[in-house]
């Protein structure tokens, strides 16, 4: 049976032109060469086909290098496979019940971790931060509107708060929150399929200075079109005032819409001409190195049109209409109308001109409430409604109908058809297009501009924007994740930066400059409006004055300040705002200067990135791993010190389960090495220095057993956190919780067949291995891997020599030694050698050193050596029935070598006679003379004989 799309579980779909059969053939050849499974089905129309494939990081790079040279590739879709799709749906479903709650930081981190789209995640991070900052602004506006004893319009307290809020928000975003997210979202090289296809024909890279000079040449063009738009806006404003307040002829209700129709028609037409004949040719002449830079240049050039069309109507009303409306008296109107014969023939009012005092309120309410509702509907509902209406009016698209009939012949299953329909929606549906980040940033910043410039008119505006943004966040999140065409693969493809790889510092770019400009301009406009209208002579505006009782108030100047004072006040506010902004910026910058310029300290290391597609319940910081390592190391050190105080002796370092604890133990002894012991890089260095010995000793045994060597296994298993050994691993007694709670069901886990304690034997073996490994690791940790074996030979005289004697050294014992070298290692942790230590003479030291050298050479060839932990009693040795003692000689010149006294007892053996104890002690003593690797094999045989 042929493979289905569902069983393939594709994570990539290639949309290509199938007009030529050679196109599909060339793709199949490349898929076969790279061993990529593929299924090719008809596309959404008769000219396209879909190639469903599943790729991974290894074969993705050569595949895209091949696709970049093909002209028939229309799009590459990083399709979400089953696992990723389930994770994203879970992430979205969590936020369904939190529509009116501010999004959490870890949710954004999980989003970036799953999609590997840092730019999109940064947009949601900006929106999240903006929402959180709107909360206090909204509550303050509500309190001013409903609880203040003064008028809420042009309130000085609200204006001061708005200015400080604006500067604080901008500074915190630029110097705290954006770097915060940039450090966490730009860890991986993101591969944009959109930029990949658009950058096929790469332009020759030009110097940035040349591009900047070419951009400056566009300034006169932008100023010209700005002047044209501003002039037309003033004309429409004058026409509106004339029709609504001066004209007294027929069709006033219909003609009143004429200015709005004119401005709504003229602005798009001017924008099309501006872009088609000036912006695009000039951008092409600038010759940018990538499509992204060219798009940014176009956005910057269009910003002039956007700013004028958005804010000029309110600026005209507040700075022209209200202050100067009183000048339009009957005499002036007569002179103006007589100058134009056409106007003189029109019927007009004979009464004096009275300004509309609520005009600015209506305009601001329209931009804050009605305009945002219209934009939200145009983005989310109108396209779908228009598509449905077109299908009912014109019928279904014939190309789509033929394509669906062709795909019907393929007889796809329901699950396969669901995947095919999803890919089709990416190509045809209104929501299927790639999520436009620039358009959404522009929408948010325009809203921000209205708030910081004109919210002193209506303090409820921040609360309205907060509600709107909470809804927009949920809708945009679903649109971007579930419906829009993905742009990035969830795994890195290009390791090095390229034109299609995003490894630079993550930033919103142009919109940061717009944010700063709006902040400074908003502070100036808010303060100036408050200065002008807080105590003006317009009824119902600002504070009430005595002139409000005068019926001829419209004939007097409504502003109590001269224009010179207003301009000087605006300049003063601008300087103060810039100074406060730079003050906030310098404070935030200084708080993030963790490492000074110059040489980076050795203990500052790069923390490994968390694995991709991992879900977190809180946002991890860059210092997350290293801080936890230090905490664990310090916690381990405090536990050791407590044990030392109780026992009056120091405990040896332990090593278990392939994890090294030597670095942590060394960190406890040397406080300056805490960070070094906890850093992953030095942990890896420590393991690599040990690898040389492990390779020479352990690889043969590990290879014969079909398992990974200890060094490889420990390297793979080691994570960034230090493993803290339990107290039981030190083999000391105390009021501690045992590793296995003793019950009747787990008796076989605690005792062997003969009733001997497994825990005591394991603790003795681990303690003994840790002692020798700690000594060897300390001496050779600075040596490379290849010199570890030679270093062991050179340092053999400096390693503490262990001499184990039991009774007479007769010929039978020597024969057993020879036989032990040929006996394979039997890993039986149930046998615990009982060894007591005492000081021997110098002659014993020499003989033992020679014997130990031979044993080390043999163990290096045959496998890992297992040393026996040695103890030295203070006054007397442990009593035994056969008075057998074990002599241990230790090199006094070795630094940091501690002698430990342990009392061993077998918990599982209670009915053992004196003869059996004597035999066991004798067997253990004679077996201890065997080479360290094979001692347990011989002990196991002796145990069976006994």
Swiss-Prot record:
Domain of life: Eukaryota
Keyword Mitochondrion recorded: no
Phosphoserine modifications at: 638, 704, 720, 729, 757, 793, 844, 847
Topological region Extracellular: 143-153, 239-253, 324-447, 527-563
Pfam short name (any one): Anoctamin
InterPro entries according to UniProt: Anoctamin, Anoctamin_TM
Biased amino acid composition, Polar residues: 859-868
Basic and acidic residues bias locations: 628-638
Positions in the Cytoplasmic compartment: 1-121, 175-217, 275-302, 469-505, 585-946
Source organism: Saccharomyces cerevisiae (strain ATCC 204508 / S288c) (Baker's yeast)
Assembly with partners or alone: Interacts with BTN2.
Protein name: Increased sodium tolerance protein 2
């Amino acid at each position: 049976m042929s493979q289905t799309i569902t069983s393939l579980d594709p994570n990539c779909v290639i949309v290509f032109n199938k007009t030529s059969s050679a196109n599909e053939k060339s793709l199949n050849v490349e898929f076969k060469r790279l061993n990529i499974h593929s299924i090719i089905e008809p596309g959404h129309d008769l000219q396209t086909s879909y190639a469903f494939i599943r790729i991974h990081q290894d074969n993705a790079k050569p595949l895209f290098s091949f696709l970049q040279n093909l002209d028939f590739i229309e799009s590459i879709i990083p399709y979400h496979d089953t696992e990723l799709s389930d994770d994203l749906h879970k992430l979205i479903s969590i936020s369904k019940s939190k529509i009116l709650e501010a999004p959490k930081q870890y949710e954004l981190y999980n989003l970036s971790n799953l999609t590997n789209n840092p730019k999109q995640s940064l947009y949601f991070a900006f929106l999240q931060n903006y929402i959180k900052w709107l909360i206090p602004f909204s509550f303050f506006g509500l309190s001013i509107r409903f609880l203040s004893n003064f008028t809420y319009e042009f309130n000085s307290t609200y204006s001061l708060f708005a200015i400080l809020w604006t500067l604080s928000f901008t500074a915190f975003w630029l110097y705290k929150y954006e770097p915060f997210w940039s450090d966490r979202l730009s860890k991986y090289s993101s591969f944009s399929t959109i930029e990949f296809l658009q950058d096929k024909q790469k332009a020759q890279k030009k110097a940035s200075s040349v591009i900047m000079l070419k951009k400056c040449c566009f300034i006169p063009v932008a100023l010209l079109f700005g002047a044209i738009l501003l002039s037309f806006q003033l004309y429409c404003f004058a026409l509106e005032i004339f029709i609504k307040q001066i004209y007294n002829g027929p069709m006033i209700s219909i003609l009143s819409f004429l200015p709005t129709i004119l401005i709504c028609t003229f602005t798009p037409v001017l924008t099309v001409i501006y872009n088609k004949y000036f912006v695009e040719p000039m951008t092409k002449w600038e010759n940018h190195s990538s499509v992204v830079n060219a798009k940014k240049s176009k956005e910057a050039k269009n910003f002039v049109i956007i700013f004028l069309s958005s804010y000029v109507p309110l600026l005209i009303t507040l700075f022209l209409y209200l202050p100067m409306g009183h000048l339009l008296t009957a005499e002036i109107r007569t002179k103006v109308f007589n100058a134009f014969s056409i106007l003189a023939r029109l019927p007009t009012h004979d009464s004096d001109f009275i300004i509309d005092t609520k005009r600015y309120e209506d305009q601001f309410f329209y931009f804050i409430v009605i305009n945002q509702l219209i934009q939200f509907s145009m983005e989310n509902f109108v396209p779908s409604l228009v598509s449905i209406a077109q299908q009912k009016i014109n019928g279904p698209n014939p190309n789509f109908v033929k394509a669906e009939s062709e795909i019907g012949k393929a007889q796809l299953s329901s699950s396969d058809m669901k995947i095919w329909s999803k890919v089709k929606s990416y190509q045809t549906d209104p929501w299927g297009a790639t999520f436009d980040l620039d358009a959404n940033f522009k929408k948010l910043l325009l809203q921000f501009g209205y708030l910081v410039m004109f919210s002193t008119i209506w303090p409820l505006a921040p609360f309205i924007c907060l509600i709107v943004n909470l809804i927009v966040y949920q809708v945009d999140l679903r649109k971007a994740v579930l419906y829009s065409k993905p742009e990035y693969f969830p795994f890195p493809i290009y390791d090095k930066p390229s034109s299609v790889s995003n490894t630079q510092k993550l930033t919103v770019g142009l919109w940061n400059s717009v944010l700063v400009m709006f902040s400074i301009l908003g502070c100036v406009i808010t303060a100036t409006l408050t200065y002008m209208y807080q105590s003006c002579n317009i009824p119902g505006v600002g504070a009430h004055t005595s002139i409000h009782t005068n019926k001829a108030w419209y004939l007097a100047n409504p502003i109590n300040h001269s224009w010179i004072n207003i301009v000087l006040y605006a300049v003063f506010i601008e300087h103060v705002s810039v100074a406060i902004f730079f003050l906030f910026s310098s404070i935030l910058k200084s708080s993030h200067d963790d490492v000074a310029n110059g040489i980076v300290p050795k203990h500052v290391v790069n923390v490994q990135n968390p694995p991709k597609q991992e879900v977190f319940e809180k946002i991890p910081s860059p210092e997350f791993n290293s801080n936890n390592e230090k905490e664990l190391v310090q916690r381990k050190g405090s536990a050791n010190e407590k044990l030392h105080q109780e026992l009056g002796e120091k405990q040896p370092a332990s090593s278990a389960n392939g994890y090294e604890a030597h670095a942590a133990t060394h960190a406890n002894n040397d406080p300056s090495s805490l960070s070094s012991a906890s850093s992953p890089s030095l942990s890896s260095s420590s393991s690599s220095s040990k690898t040389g010995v492990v390779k020479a000793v352990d690889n043969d045994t590990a290879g014969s057993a079909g398992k990974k060597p200890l060094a490889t296994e420990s390297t793979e298993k080691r994570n960034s956190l230090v493993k803290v050994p339990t107290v039981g691993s030190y083999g000391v007694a105390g009021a501690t919780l045992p590793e296995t709670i003793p019950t009747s069901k787990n008796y076989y886990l605690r005792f062997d067949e003969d009733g001997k304690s497994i825990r005591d034997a394991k603790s003795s073996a681990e303690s003994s291995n840790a002692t020798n490994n700690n000594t060897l690791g300390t001496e050779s940790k600075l040596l490379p891997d290849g010199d570890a074996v030679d270093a062991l030979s050179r340092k053999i005289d400096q390693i503490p020599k262990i001499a184990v004697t039991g009774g007479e050294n007769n010929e039978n014992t020597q024969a057993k030694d020879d036989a032990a070298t040929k006996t394979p290692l039997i890993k039986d942790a149930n046998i615990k050698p009982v060894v007591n230590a005492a000081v021997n003479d110098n002659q014993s030291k020499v003989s033992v050193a020679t014997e130990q050298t031979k044993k080390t050479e043999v163990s290096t060839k045959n496998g890992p050596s297992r040393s026996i932990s040695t103890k030295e009693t203070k006054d007397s040795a442990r009593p035994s029935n056969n008075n057998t003692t074990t002599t241990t000689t230790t090199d006094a010149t070795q630094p940091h070598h501690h002698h430990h006294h342990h009392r061993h007892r077998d918990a599982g053996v209670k009915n053992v006679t004196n003869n059996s104890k004597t035999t066991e002690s004798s067997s253990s003593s004679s077996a201890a003379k065997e080479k360290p690797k094979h001692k347990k094999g011989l002990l196991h045989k002796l145990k069976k004989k006994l």
